[in-house]
């Protein structure tokens, strides 16, 4: 597929994949993007998932017009992008492999070969001239692996962005970018906001007209929109006004409290996203918890702790540096409710977390006193 006169798309899509990275549901499949620049010298950018190696090499061959590549540029070593490096090297024996020093160490671990006789090690600011096109390499460590680099092509103002600006879904899926890009970001990159911010600062110094990520669609217009969202996400800012309610309920009493709270909040005209953690896709609940500025957690005391799905959810937030949010708590316990205390303690190392003064404490079923507490909590969480 032609991107520009000299830049072509040679990636593939897995439309049958159910779980990306073994945990993220991908109902629209997954794209593994790869690119080639055709110039005096030919550079290929990244490979694809192992099971698509032959299809990818065919895509490449169809764009080469009988020529052979001079370089394979490896921006990211995660196996969904690097699995076919050795296969490429076997087919194109004269091609040089270009990547960071850390990436070559990973190649030794994955393939038993650092390609010492045919490698070019690059670092921040290094350049690779292809003829009309020149690549400048930019370090992007921990976005989201330590070896990551991105590449800027100056003549056509292209940023080859590795996993940054990626999203779930096959390449040709027509869907709102932000939804699945947000879920991808907070699921996979979210822990590394500082590092993503560092990359954005470097990108701000470049004149970029197109962003070419390793997952999802090419970003070719209105780049300020995408850059703005990435800035909000990576700085742990609030994207939209609203409240996320995440809950678990054993016999329906905690769920009843959640429904009452949702009604009270919606009366004020505020958006509410509700997730039953035992049944929902956890990554969507995590996405909403970061999208909105307010979060209510509702669960039962369980084995002198909290219900396992809630524990997992809180862990998913805190390990991604959840911060700058207001949290409300609802607990339920038939004889010794301790869930609120445990949930509050789980955020003790999180930055800029404000807890609502009212904690709804249910002992068994929702009482009239609880209903009054719920009305108070609704006012506090949106205030």
Residue ranges and their predicted role:
Residues 45-47, 69-77, 97-100, 159-163, ...:
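Active-site neighborhood of phospho(di)ester-bond hydrolases with catalytic His/Asp-centered motifs
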Residues 212-239:
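Short N-terminal or domain-adjacent regulatory/targeting segments
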Residues 144, 148, 164-191, 234-239:
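Active-site-proximal loop/helix segment associated with metal-binding centers of metalloenzymes
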Residues 171-211, 215-218, 260-275, 285-383:
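FMN-binding flavodoxin-like domain, especially the glycine-rich phosphate-binding loop
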Residues 51-98:
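Active-site metal-binding motif and surrounding structural segment of the metallo-beta-lactamase
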Residues 2-5, 99-148, 192-198:
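Metallo-beta-lactamase
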Residues 84, 281-285:
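Short acidic active-site motifs
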Residues 2-61, 150-153, 157-161, 254:
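Conserved beta-strand hairpin/beta-sheet module of binuclear metal-dependent hydrolase folds
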């Amino acid at each position: 597929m032609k991107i520009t006169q000299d830049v072509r798309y040679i990636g593939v899509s897995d439309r049958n994949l159910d779980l990306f990275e073994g945990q993220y549901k991908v109902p629209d499949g997954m794209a593994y993007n790869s690119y080639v620049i055709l110039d005096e010298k030919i550079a290929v950018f990244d490979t694809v998932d192992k099971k698509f190696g032959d299809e990818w090499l065919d895509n490449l061959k169809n764009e080469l017009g009988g020529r052979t590549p001079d370089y394979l540029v490896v921006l990211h070593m995660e196996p969904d992008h690097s699995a076919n490096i050795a296969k490429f090297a076997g087919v194109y024996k004269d091609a040089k492999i270009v990547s960071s020093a850390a990436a070559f160490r990973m190649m030794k671990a994955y393939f038993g070969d650092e390609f010492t006789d045919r490698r070019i090690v690059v670092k921040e600011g290094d350049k690779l001239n292809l003829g009309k096109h020149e690549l400048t390499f930019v370090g992007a460590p921990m976005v989201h692996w330590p070896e990551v680099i991105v590449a800027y092509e100056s003549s056509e103002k292209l940023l080859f962005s590795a996993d940054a600006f990626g999203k779930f879904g096959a390449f040709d899926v027509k869907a709102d970018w932000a939804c699945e890009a947000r879920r991808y970001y907070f699921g996979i990159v979210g822990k590394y906001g500082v590092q993503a911010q560092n990359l954005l600062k470097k990108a701000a110094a470049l004149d970029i007209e197109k962003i070419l990520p390793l997952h999802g669609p090419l970003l070719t217009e209105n780049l300020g929109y995408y850059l703005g969202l990435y800035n909000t996400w990576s700085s742990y800012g609030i994207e939209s006004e609203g409240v996320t309610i995440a809950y678990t309920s054993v016999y329906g009493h905690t769920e009843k409290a959640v429904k009452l709270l949702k009604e009270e909040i919606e009366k004020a005209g505020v958006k509410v996203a509700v997730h039953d953690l035992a049944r929902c896709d956890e990554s969507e609940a995590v996405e909403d918890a970061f999208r909105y500025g307010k979060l209510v957690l509702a669960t039962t005391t369980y084995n002198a702790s909290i219900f396992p799905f809630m524990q997992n959810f809180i862990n998913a937030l805190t390990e991604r540096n959840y911060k700058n949010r207001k949290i409300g708590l609802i607990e339920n316990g038939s004889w010794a409710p301790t869930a609120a205390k445990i949930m509050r303690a789980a955020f003790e190392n999180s930055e800029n977390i404000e807890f609502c003064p009212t904690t709804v404490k249910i002992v068994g079923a929702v009482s009239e006193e609880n209903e009054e507490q719920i009305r108070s909590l609704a006012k506090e969480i949106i205030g």
